[in-house]
Amino acid sequence: MVEYNVTSTTLEPKTGWPVVDRLLGGYTELETLNGQVVARCLVAIILCRFIAVWSYNLWFHPLARFPGPFLGRCSLLYRFIHSSRGRIHSAVADAHKKYGDIVRIAPNELSFASVESWKAIYGHPTRGNEIAPKGPFYEVFAAGFNSKCVGSERNPEKHALMRKMLNPAFSQRGLLEQEEIISGTIDKFVHVLGEKAGPGTKGLNMTKWYEMNSFDILGEMAFGESFHSLDTGIPHFWADVVLEHLYIITLLDNLRRIGWLAKLAGLLIPASLVTKNQNSNYSRQQVEKRLGIQKSRNDFVSLLVDKVRAGEVSKEEMTAHVSTITIAGGETVATTLSGLTCFLAQNPDKLERLTKEIRAAFKTFEEINAVKSQQIPYLQAVINEGLRLFPPASGGAPRVSPGFTLHDKYIPKGTEVNVSPWSITHNAKYFSDPWEFKPERWLDPNSKDIKDASRPFLLGPRDCLGRNFALMELNLVLAKLLWSYDMELVNKEINFLEQSTVHVLWWKPGLFVRWHKPQSPGFSPS
């Protein structure tokens, strides 16, 4: 039986055999080791783990031969730091300037910045080459829904079926049939600006008002009812939820690259605090309302409603579709309009030319329509230049390499690949004076600019479904606004590009504008 010396400051065993006592005494000393030693051991183990992983990424990984910033080649820190700050687009552009057209920005991720890369990654497959499927990012984008949608479906065959189902609603013909709904909201928008942002006022924050207009249009088109932001003058809460949702997606897209950390985050973050659930739950409520409308409507989702009622499409799939259409369609168009407003106001000669051409094209406000607006050459040049200078999806569209060769370099299968729109459109190799707002470049037959370097709507079998809708709204809003008013930027010194940040889509600074009725006879829509 072992006795213990209870008078000692530590609990020491006493057996009566000196040798055994010494052995047991040494053992119990381990139990009294302080936490610092244990902590140091854990730190050493973790450090060794990092050194091993970083060494593999730097010298033995299949992408080890590709250049890039040190933190990007060895770890995820480069991506984490710059994406959390909303400046990943700018950091990647700087990396391309230093390292060339192909840059390794994460251990298993390559960024591309060449005209050839657009077709190689997003174009139709040629000569038996497989199509590059969408990347794991889209799994994160679909979070909150129990169904994939046209924006998140990664399987090319399933995506093609979804596109075929939705294409008629977004065709030029389909949209012209819906123009009355779109124009009705825009007319209200133009009227409200004249009332609230005329001479003597502080102006209105057009960053928010363009979002309100776009969301009201999409409320009509996707859910059968406006969000009434233009009526109240207050952004609908869903617009703010969308921006928070996009920030959460940025965070989760980083975490998903470290599997165990993503699982831990899922356990630590209560579902009620994750805005993706607010987004999906509100979408479900709105879809239920839309399905309850019995009167026939000519909008985006009429075909979907019929298919849900026929049992061909689930309500959850319809919900995922309309949520994606609202987020992508609302934010991107509003972003482009905000950028164009700032660029035009800061370049009065461009604004004057555009205004004159619009007012010369239409004698009355009622004459303005989508078809005639899109026949004004300088208006198209202005829109193209705005999309180049401020690409609405500057974060890119990630894909997974099926295994292909580009610029004489083999891109291993399974590599995450992405074209950086910002890097290409701000490269002097493709556009002269890339940081200048020069719509004339799109009209000059002698221009040496490589126009195909700007692909705001992507290309190939998974190009932007809403391209025609976006162009229709951009043309109608600009034509009706500039026909009705002269524009005055209040915060003239704003650096719009520098103050905007990317979290999937753009977070933009306030842009305050006054709208003056022109001296010549005009029209104030009712």
Curated annotation (Swiss-Prot):
CDD domains: CYP60B-like. Its EC number is 1.-.-.-. Pathway: Secondary metabolite biosynthesis. InterPro entries: Cyt_P450, Cyt_P450_E_grp-I, Cyt_P450_sf, Cytochrome_P450_monoxygenase. GO terms for molecular function: heme binding; iron ion binding; monooxygenase activity; oxidoreductase activity, acting on paired donors, with incorporation or reduction of molecular oxygen. It is found in: Membrane. Pfam families: p450. Glycans are attached at residues 5, 205, 281. Disruption phenotype: Abolishes the production of botrydial and accumulates 5-hydroxy-7-(oct-2-enoyl)botrylactone, 6-beta-hydroxy-7-deoxybo-trylactone, cinbotolide B, and cinbotolide C. Heme binds at residue 464. The chain crosses the membrane at residues 41-61. Induction: The botrydial biosynthesis cluster genes are co-regulated by the Ca(2+)/calcineurin signal transduction pathway, which is under the control of the alpha subunit BCG1 of a heterotrimeric G protein. Expression of the cluster is also positively regulated by the cluster-specific transcription factor BOT6. The keyword Metal-binding applies. Gene3D superfamilies: Cytochrome P450. SUPFAM superfamilies: Cytochrome P450. One of its GO terms (biological process) is biosynthetic process. Its cofactor is heme. PANTHER family: CYTOCHROME P450, CYTOCHROME P450 MONOOXYGENASE ASQL-RELATED. Cytochrome P450 monooxygenase; part of the gene cluster that mediates the biosynthesis of botrydial. Botrydial is necessary for colonization of plant tissue by the T4 strain. It is a strain-dependent virulence factor since highly aggressive strains like SAS56 or B05 still retain substantial virulence when botrydial synthesis is impaired, since they produce also botcinic acid. The first step of botrydial biosynthesis is performed by the sesquiterpene synthase BOT2 which catalyzes the cyclization of farnesyl diphosphate (FPP) to presilphiperfolan-8-beta-ol (PSP). Belongs to the cytochrome P450 family. This is Cytochrome P450 monooxygenase BOT4. The lineage of its organism: Eukaryota, Fungi, Dikarya, Ascomycota, Pezizomycotina.
